[in-house]
A protein has these predicted regions:
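Conserved CoA-thioester-binding segment of acyl-CoA-metabolizing enzymes
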Residues: 1-27, 49, 60-63, 166, ...
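Short, conserved active-site loops that position catalytic residues or coordinate cofactors/metal ions
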Residues: 25, 32-40
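A short acidic, glycine-rich active-site loop
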Residues: 42-56
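Glycine-rich beta-to-alpha active-site loop
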Residues: 61-109, 138-141
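C-terminal long alpha-helix characteristic of the crotonase
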Residues: 95-100, 150-199, 212, 228-233
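Hydrophobic, secondary-structure "cap" segments at the distal end of domains
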Residues: 118-127
Length: 233
């Protein structure tokens, strides 16, 4: 159900450039404990196609979240485990409490972090991500910051709110179309053959520079004024 709710939100906002970002946080001070183990238990004795269909669906939603044109922010309180932490790794910015609990716990129950693995490696690097997933290590927010799982670590609720507000202010200073193009560049570059990387980057840059936002951004800098997309909160 949570996966379908997330998919519905993504589908609603992905083409709306007036929506500048999306924040994901848990209800009641708890981010996400991961998948439905009772459902997994029933599925373990069912048809192979059923479990594969479920995994594919999760994979497609995570891919859409990762590529969402808007800036995505995960605010983590309580705990973020397994697939829930994988969702956070798809986000552009991760903020969490120092006492929150983290872990990619799949191998402890005999399964793999299949659909989230590439996003874990994307977030905290190959060596660290590999160790965390293979050993199902558990760690707190302070260590999550050192490992690169969290971008910002807060000691209390007030600090968490301030960090979230700071990220929102930064986002609202950025051109929404340029943000979308930047994410296309970041996601597309690794899969682009080396012989095509220069051309891919040049087209991305030129498309932005000669677009309405590029013209407005350069003009606003020269004229020493704020661009028309700048919004304050």
């Amino acid at each position: 159900e949570a996966v379908e709710d997330l998919a519905a939100v993504i589908d609603t906002i992905k083409d709306q450039r007036d929506i500048r970002g999306m924040t994901i946080r848990g209800k009641g001070g708890f981010f996400c404990a991961g998948g439905d183990l009772k459902g997994f238990n029933a599925m373990a004795s069912g048809a192979t196609e059923e479990s594969m269909r479920m995994s594919r669906r999760i994979g497609h939603v995570l891919a859409e979240l990762n590529a969402l044109p808007q800036v995505t922010v995960a605010v983590i309180e309580g705990a973020a485990m397994a697939g829930g932490l994988g969702v956070a790794c798809c986000c552009d910015v991760t903020i969490g409490m120092s006492d929150a609990k983290f872990g990619f716990s799949e191998t402890r129950i005999g399964i793999t972090p299949a659909q989230i693995a590439r996003y874990v490696l994307q977030k905290c690097g190959y060596s660290t991500g590999r160790r965390l997933m293979v050993t199902a290590a558990r760690f707190k927010g302070d260590e999550a910051g050192r490992l690169g799982v969290l971008d910002f670590v807060a000691e209390d609720a007030h600090a968490l709110a301030n960090l979230e507000a700071k990220v929102k202010r930064d986002v609202l200073e950025c051109a929404p179309g340029a943000v979308a193009a930047c994410k296309e560049l970041i996601i597309g570059m690794p899969a682009t053959p080396d012989s095509e990387k220069v051309e891919f980057a040049a087209m991305n840059f030129s498309g932005c520079l000669q677009g309405e936002e590029g013209k407005e951004g350069v003009a606003s800098f020269v004229e020493k004024r704020k661009p028309n997309w700048h919004t304050e909160i």
